[in-house]
From Swiss-Prot:
Biased composition regions of type Basic and acidic residues, renumbered to the chain: 191-201
Family: Belongs to the RRG9 family.
Pfam families per UniProt: Neugrin (PF06413)
Compositionally biased spans, kind Polar residues: 71-81
Organism encoding this protein: Uncinocarpus reesii (strain UAMH 1704)
Role summary: Required for respiratory activity and maintenance and expression of the mitochondrial genome.
Main location: mitochondrion
Top-level taxon of the source organism: Eukaryota
Name by which UniProt lists this protein: Required for respiratory growth protein 9, mitochondrial
PANTHER family per the UniProt record, alphabetical: NEUGRIN (PTHR13475:SF3)
Coiled-coil positions: none
Length: 221
């Protein structure tokens, strides 16, 4: 077939350790068509700065203008000294988890929805728990403190483990929050009829009238 040159079965070059498979290098001459055999022609890779350099066959000469080579896309250069990542992954042993990681996974499994205790201790009660445990850890252990304060042992454990201490500004904010919480609980219990209604500035009980007192009907107290 005119215009077609068949290269040897195995073609090597010192610049590239990859052997080139049999392929058909075609001419770009106008009179030639790109006839090729799919069983022999492989993917075309342009090599500009490295690798084997082959030019197009033009009038029986090699042109240096364009460089190309035919090689399989699956043939990748692998160094014989490079380790196999799959073999290393199989040989590496699984290291044991640290104690804090084991405990964290156990708590996450136990409290799937997060830590949300039904009962919360006030800041004064928390300081009392720490002080009692500091004075006599054997007598005031975690189960004893949990039974005394009517909370779970996990809550006592978290209180004793925590090293965070609030500043003076934070203590003032916490005091205000707990005052509001106390009023909210009192209002809820008063709605249930367990406690009398709390007297607030907006409550009608605060603006008492002394209708019951003689001589001062209709006047505020």
């Amino acid at each position: 077939m005119p215009g077609i040159t068949r290269w040897p079965a195995v073609l090597k070059n010192e610049a590239s350790p990859i052997p080139l498979r049999p392929a058909l290098i075609l001419s770009r001459a106008p009179q030639n068509r790109f006839y090729h055999d799919r069983s022999e022609l492989h993917d075309l890779h342009i090599v500009r700065n490295h690798g084997v350099k082959f030019g197009n066959v033009i009038s029986g000469r090699l042109s240096d203008s364009n460089y190309c080579r035919y090689a399989s896309t699956n043939s990748k250069p692998t160094s014989p000294e490079s380790p196999d990542p799959i073999a290393e992954k199989k040989t590496t042993k699984k290291q044991p988890q640290q104690q804090w990681r084991v405990q964290k996974d156990a708590l996450k499994k136990k409290f799937a929805e997060g830590w949300a205790p039904p009962k919360r201790l006030s800041p004064d009660a928390i300081e009392g728990v720490r002080e009692l445990h500091r004075q006599n850890p054997q007598k005031f252990s975690t189960p004893v403190l949990a039974e005394h304060f009517k909370v779970s042992p996990e809550a006592i454990r978290r209180i004793l483990k925590s090293k965070w201490r609030p500043s003076e500004k934070e203590m003032e904010k916490r005091k205000i929050r707990w005052e509001k919480r106390k009023d909210r609980i009192w209002d809820h219990m008063s709605e249930l009829g367990l406690r009398p209604r709390r007297e607030t500035p907006d409550s009608p009980l605060e603006t008492k009238t002394i209708d019951k007192l003689p001589g001062n009907q209709g006047k505020p107290f």
